[in-house]
Amino acid sequence: MLIGLTGTPGTGKTSVSKFLERKRHWKVIHLNEMIKEEHLYTEVDEVRDAVIADMELVRQRLEEIIGGKENEVIILESHLAHYIADIVIILRVYPPELKMRLKARGYSEEKIRENIEAEALDVILVEAFEWCKKVFEINTTGKSIEETEQHIEKIIDHILSGNEEELPEYKPGSIDWIDLVP
């Protein structure tokens, strides 16, 4: 079962997925790393300091990796995961906290602004609704990696047992920061 762990850069995807990998021994595919390492991109955007993924090549490579493992929990970690996985968990964070996290990473002011706007406008959530069958949201604001991991585990365990309707606290659209948009 492929489960996407997605969200705006800086919401905690990589940190929490590495924790899940160690704790639950679930296979985690760090998609952004794979795209760069295996040259699964069409071009490099120097201005935005990013690569433009070739999604067809990415899908082909994932089929090679995942083929025959449909009964295993496989987590696809990336801000692009919602374009591939049918089930996604979106990590969200309060935009002012996101700004601090991205500054600490050394992001440019332009890239920080772009990501804060994307978070406040629910860009990934809207895209996930277009692409995915099941969508869940977790507010990671002020939460430790361990706390976030517990929320993810709860969601996945409920999905595996077929009880995801018992998860109203992760209902998409319950997190709203639109008032923060200038």
Curated annotation (Swiss-Prot):
SUPFAM superfamilies: P-loop containing nucleoside triphosphate hydrolases (SSF52540). It is an enzyme of class 2 (transferase). It catalyses: AMP + ATP = 2 ADP; ATP + H2O = ADP + phosphate + H(+). Residues 104-114 are annotated as: LID. Its EC number is 2.7.4.3. Residues 30-53 are annotated as: NMP. Interacts with uS11. Not a structural component of 40S pre-ribosomes, but transiently interacts with them by binding to uS11. Belongs to the adenylate kinase family. AK6 subfamily. Broad-specificity nucleoside monophosphate (NMP) kinase that catalyzes the reversible transfer of the terminal phosphate group between nucleoside triphosphates and monophosphates. Also has ATPase activity. Involved in the late maturation steps of the 30S ribosomal particles, specifically 16S rRNA maturation. While NMP activity is not required for ribosome maturation, ATPase activity is. Associates transiently with small ribosomal subunit protein uS11. ATP hydrolysis breaks the interaction with uS11. This is Putative adenylate kinase.
